[in-house]
Amino acid sequence: MKPRVYSNLKKLWEKHGAHDFGRISQIFFGFCLIERQFQIKIFQLTGRPDIVAVRNNKKFAFEVKTQSGSDVAIKNEDLLGVKGYTEQAIIAVLSYPDLDCMWVLAKANDIRAGKWPIAFLKQHSISSLEDELNESFQKIIEKYFTTAYLGTTSLYDVFEEVCKLEKNK
C-alpha cells in the first residue's frame, strides 16, 4: 500500500478510536465490493454476518475485522456468523497498523476461534479475491477519506446512497 493510505488510516484511527475505526473500515470494505461488481444483499454494522454479497451468482458472507496489534481476535461467534451461511464464508481482516496494510480474506471454514497473526490468516486466504479488493482499497480510501473523517454516520449515509444507485442500475 502507498504511504498515504497508511497515513490516512492512522488519522482515522486517531480521530475516531478503535470502535468507529472498525465500522469505517467495514464501510470501506463494502465500497470495495461494490467497485468489484458485487451486489450487497445484507450490510450491518452490528450483528453477524457483517456483509452478504453476490457476484456471478455466487454468494459470499463476510465478517469484517480490524486489529490493534500484531494479532487479530476471531471469536467463535464470528465464525458461526458466516459458516454454513453461503458458498463462501470469509473472515476479512484489515492488517492495519501494519505499514503495508491490506485486506486479508481468510476462509472461515479453514480456521478456528483464537488470536491469530496475519501471516497465519494469509495461509488460508482467497488470494485472487484479496488482490482484487486490495487494488480497489487504495482508490476507495482516497475517494471517501474526507467523508470518513467526519465520522461513521456521514460515511454510512454515502454508502447507503451508493447501494441504492447500484440496485437501480
Can you say where each PLM-predicted feature lies in the sequence?
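Non-catalytic C-terminal interaction segments of nucleic acid-processing enzymes
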Residues: M1, E35, D98, V104-K169
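N-terminal cationic amphipathic segment used for targeting or macromolecule association
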Residues: I51, K59, I90, T146, ...
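Short secondary-structure capping/turn micro-motifs that flank functional sites
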Residues: R48-D50, D98
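Acidic-basic catalytic patches of nuclease active cores, encompassing PD-(D/E)XK
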Residues: M1-F43, G47
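Conserved catalytic cores of phosphodiester-cleaving nucleases, focusing on short active-site segments
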Residues: L33, I51-S68
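Catalytic cores of nucleic-acid endonucleases
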Residues: S7-H16, R36, I42, T66-K115
